[in-house]
Regions:
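N-terminal intrinsically disordered/low-complexity leader segments
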Residues: 1-16, 80-83, 191-202, 231-250
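Helix-turn-helix
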Residues: 20, 24, 28-62, 66
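Amphipathic alpha-helical interaction segments
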Residues: 20, 62, 93, 124, ...
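Short hydrophobic clusters on alpha-helical segments that form packing/core surfaces
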Residues: 21-29, 67, 71, 98, ...
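Hydrophobic alpha-helical connector segments
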Residues: 77-124, 140-141, 147-150
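Hydrophobic alpha-helical bundle segments that form small-molecule/ligand-binding pockets
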Residues: 125-149, 154-182, 204, 223-226
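Non-DNA-binding regulatory cores of transcription-related proteins
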Residues: 186-203, 207-214, 218
Length: 250
């Protein structure tokens, strides 16, 4: 048998872990945005065949679920765990921590809100939020509704901030993003959009921390007001029902 006919020995199999796969996926998302982390792309990044990735994650959705858990698991619970701090300060600390942590990986944010967040780290964060709202005096039902409202606001705000930047990679500094938005609004004809022109500086700052906290504080004040008036129906709900009845009778 000639040397060329001899069977080739296979090299040692590449060792692989779930953490390596998730690291590679997050790197690809950071570099190329939400479409960059395909199974083939992840496999190429870690130097294995796609089948090796499928051994740990059956599809991209499973990789995304793992990434969601990875990112939520990196949230610092100490910033809102101190029971001696007022509950509003603790909710604000959680909201700011989530914004800072997730905005560091803008390519992952659209994937996070595109599917369920129901892993252990997500459930733990939800439990902590329910505890905070319970400390505010809300009953379990209102605490759950308020928690959902806060989750929608926090993740929705982060998603809109990320979507405002039309290129992959890390978010530019806040001042740069606000300036870019101001330039875009200034280019719009003020005779067609006079109110927008008047409010352009405020609208440009929609992506600012100041705006984020402004909205959060209004929500927290609304939650507090709802608790203070929980013995009777909410005026807005009463108006809505009355208006419908009057419209129907007319």
């Amino acid at each position: 048998m000639s040397v060329s006919e001899m069977p080739r020995r296979r090299g040692p199999r590449r060792a692989l872990t779930e953490d390596e796969i998730l690291d590679a996926a997050l790197d690809l998302l950071d570099e190329g945005g939400p479409d960059a982390a395909s199974i083939r792309g992840i496999a190429a990044r870690v130097g294995v065949a796609p089948n090796a990735v499928y051994t740990y994650f059956p599809d991209k959705a499973a990789v995304v679920s793992g990434l969601v858990e990875r990112l939520l698991g990196g949230v610092d619970h100490d910033v809102f765990a101190d029971p001696e701090r007022p509950w509003r300060e603790r909710v604000e600390a959680l909201a700011l921590e989530l914004r800072a942590h997730l905005s560091a990986h803008p390519g992952a944010v659209p994937l996070m809100i595109g599917g369920p967040m129901d892993g252990p780290h997500a459930l733990t964060l939800n439990e902590r939020l329910l505890e905070l709202l319970g400390d505010a005096g809300l009953d379990p039902t209102d605490a759950a509704r308020a928690a959902y409202l806060l989750i929608v606001y926090v993740f929705g705000s982060i998603a809109l901030e990320v979507a405002d930047v039309h290129r992959p990679g890390p978010l530019p500094p806040e001042a740069e993003r606000v300036a870019d938005r101001q330039a875009a609004f200034s280019a719009a004809p003020s005779d067609q959009f006079p109110r927008s022109a008047q409010a352009s500086a405020t609208m440009a700052a929609y992506v600012s921390t100041e705006q984020y906290l402004w909205g959060l504080h209004r929500i927290l004040s609304g939650i507090t007001a709802r608790e203070a008036t929980s013995d009777g129906p909410e005026p807005a709900e009463t108006h809505g029902r009355t208006g419908l009845r009057e419209a129907h009778s007319a």
